[in-house]
Design a protein with these regions (language model features):
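Bacterial N-terminal signal peptides that target proteins for export
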Residues: 1-12
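Helix-centric, low-specificity signal for extended rod-like, repetitive segments
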Residues: 1-2, 18, 112
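Bacterial N-terminal signal peptides
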Residues: 11-21
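Flexible, surface-exposed loop/linker segments and immediately adjacent secondary-structure boundaries
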Residues: 26-150
Length: 150
């Protein structure tokens, strides 16, 4: 190995390590299936359109405008529907499709949200929660709706 190739290999190794780390961090956890009106996704300080087909990641914040609504399917088949003037944060999400084990924590900061629970909550009812500014809701059934006025 020549002296010039050693730094090149180190640099290449660092680039590959960073690429793998960024891919591992950006795991898709769900997808927008229905989008009407003004819908946006805030991710890492940037705002992107909440269009049909947009992939969602942990820590995404979905915002709907006065004419907006959004339908989301998570990888465990949970269905989320947010109405106008809603702010929904996907705080924590982990799902193993082999065992149906996982954890799904979200926060509704304002607006309305309807949920049909998927495989995570069916496997372990304590594993899915929705926080609001005044309460923490544990999913014990298969369907529920919540509204936050501000």
């Amino acid at each position: 190995m020549t002296a010039a190739s050693a730094p090149s290999r180190v640099a290449l190794s660092l680039v590959l390590a960073l690429a793998v780390a960024s891919v591992a961090h950006a795991i898709d956890i769900g997808q927008i299936k229905v989008s009407r009106g003004d819908v946006a996704i805030e991710r890492g300080g940037q705002t992107v359109p909440g269009a049909v087909g947009a992939r969602l990641q942990t820590s995404d914040v979905i915002k709907t405008g006065t004419d907006g609504s959004v339908g989301i399917t998570m990888s465990d088949n949970s269905l989320l529907s947010a109405g106008p003037n809603s702010v929904l944060s996907l705080d924590k999400y982990a799902f193993d499709a082999t065992t149906n084990q996982g954890q799904f924590d979200s926060s509704l900061r304002k607006g309305s949200l309807s949920v049909v629970s998927g495989r995570i909550a069916k496997q372990s009812p304590d594993a899915m929660t929705v926080r609001t500014p005044t309460a923490i809701l544990g999913v014990r059934g298969t369907e529920f709706a919540v509204s936050v006025d501000q």
